[in-house]
Amino acid sequence: MTDSTRSLRNCLAPAKLNLFLHITGRRPNGYHDLQSVFQLLNWGDTLHFTLRDDGRVARATDVPGVPEESDLVVRAANLLKAHTGTVAGVDIEIDKCLPMGAGLGGGSSDAATTLLALNRLWQLDLSRAELQSLAVKLGADVPFFVFGKNAFAEGIGEELAEVQLPTRWFLVVTPRVHVPTAEIFSDELLTRDTKPVTIADFLARRNSDAGWPDSFGRNDMQQVVTSKYAEVAQVVKWLYNVTPSRMTGSGASVFAVFRSRHEAEAVKANLPTGWNGAVAESLNEHPLFAFAS
């Protein structure tokens, strides 16, 4: 990342994985109570921010299928501007790397990186807690990325407690299909009564490391997604025959964990033609963590 008084370049918006994802209830407003552990990855979209003197917020690059006015990045910048009353403006460039509809948190991470970067570029000095209170207005996953640490998540995903996770390498395989999150959450077959667990339960099992990630919990959405999307089912079956694996979020991406990059790359090299695989190392902290206190 490069930093100047007029711009912030090469700001990473890291992907996340759900190491497990349990749906424990449904609220009257339609939101779901969940439990999960969010893992940051050193892989994601890259954003660039340049000050404007006319006060406008503008997206300087096109994102196919995402109109500028509905882009979470633009919404995040405008929300921050309205909250603080700053007269500053910004041009935002987005180098998309993460596939959309993949369960990797791409749009949410872009929004969080925008909040953190503009907190620095616009010299706002908002606290992390204040940024998180804005982030929840943009989506359930956005507060996690502002939180900036690997976390045990509860509520709708906004109740976060830091967890220390071992350094690992991940292979993330994404079939060529977009899975709408709302469609999966509304499916009548989705399990919504999984028994709550504790952070101690997860840490005890994780530390044993036997067969991780599938040694603890499950992804309650995986069965619904694989029943509706054959492409995801094919990836799950193929990868699980090689190593323990699991779908992240509402899909479509499926991941496996390895102790070394070499092991992950070896499996990636054997992926069927046409499948998109990425190898990434775990992160313990968001690259822009220091941009809020």
Curated annotation (Swiss-Prot):
What SUPFAM superfamilies does this protein map onto? GHMP Kinase, C-terminal domain, Ribosomal protein S5 domain 2-like
Q: Which GO terms describe its biological process?
A: isopentenyl diphosphate biosynthetic process, methylerythritol 4-phosphate pathway; terpenoid biosynthetic process
Q: Which InterPro entries does its entry note?
A: GHMP_kinase_C_dom (IPR013750), GHMP_kinase_C_sf (IPR036554), GHMP_kinase_N_dom (IPR006204), IspE (IPR004424), Ribosomal_Su5_D2-typ_SF (IPR020568), Ribsml_uS5_D2-typ_fold_subgr (IPR014721)
Q: Copy the pathway line from the protein's UniProt record.
A: Isoprenoid biosynthesis; isopentenyl diphosphate biosynthesis via DXP pathway; isopentenyl diphosphate from 1-deoxy-D-xylulose 5-phosphate: step 3/6
Entry's Gene Ontology molecular function annotations: 4-(cytidine 5'-diphospho)-2-C-methyl-D-erythritol kinase activity; ATP binding
* EC numbers, comma separated: 2.7.1.148
* Enzyme class, spelled out: transferase
Q: One Pfam family, please name it.
A: GHMP_kinases_N
So what does this one do? Catalyzes the phosphorylation of the position 2 hydroxy group of 4-diphosphocytidyl-2C-methyl-D-erythritol.
Name listed for the protein in its UniProt record:
4-diphosphocytidyl-2-C-methyl-D-erythritol kinase
Question: Which lineage do the record's taxonomy fields give for this organism?
Answer: Bacteria, Pseudomonadati, Pseudomonadota, Betaproteobacteria, Burkholderiales
Gene symbol here is ispE
